[in-house]
Amino acid sequence: MGCCGCGSCGGCGGGCGGCGGGCGGGCGGGCGGVCGSCTTCRCYRVGCCSSCCPCCRGCCGGCCSTPVICCCRRTCRSCGCGCRKGCCQQKCCCQKQCCC
């Protein structure tokens, strides 16, 4: 649950049992701890990384891509203006780059 995938192959299925198809590299820095953080896509929530880059899935629906830092907090469930579940710079925003 919430394991970090290879990115290029779309993440690991079956509870992080491994990536089939032989994708190399992928995450690069990878996720620390139990996918508590992605050094590449900067998604800060435990169990948020199903595939490291370019998007973090399962974390309030937030999408992270450098250089824009998008953080997902459970307190930000809605931005109220079209952006379903996006948090940018710890504030709810409506920019497309902050939403998945």
Swiss-Prot record:
Gene Ontology cellular component terms for the protein in this record: intermediate filament
Region named 13 X 2 AA repeats of CG: 4-82
Keywords: Keratin, Repeat
Superkingdom assignment: Eukaryota
Keyword Flavoprotein annotated: no
The keyword Repeat belongs to this UniProt entry's keyword annotation: yes
Note: Human have a similar number of genes as other primates despite the relative hairlessness of humans.
Function field: In the hair cortex, hair keratin intermediate filaments are embedded in an interfilamentous matrix, consisting of hair keratin-associated proteins (KRTAP), which are essential for the formation of a rigid and resistant hair shaft through their extensive disulfide bond cross-linking with abundant cysteine residues of hair keratins. The matrix proteins include the high-sulfur and high-glycine-tyrosine keratins.
Family the entry assigns: Belongs to the KRTAP type 28 family.
Protein name (record): Small cysteine and glycine repeat-containing protein 3
Gene symbol of the encoding locus: SCYGR3
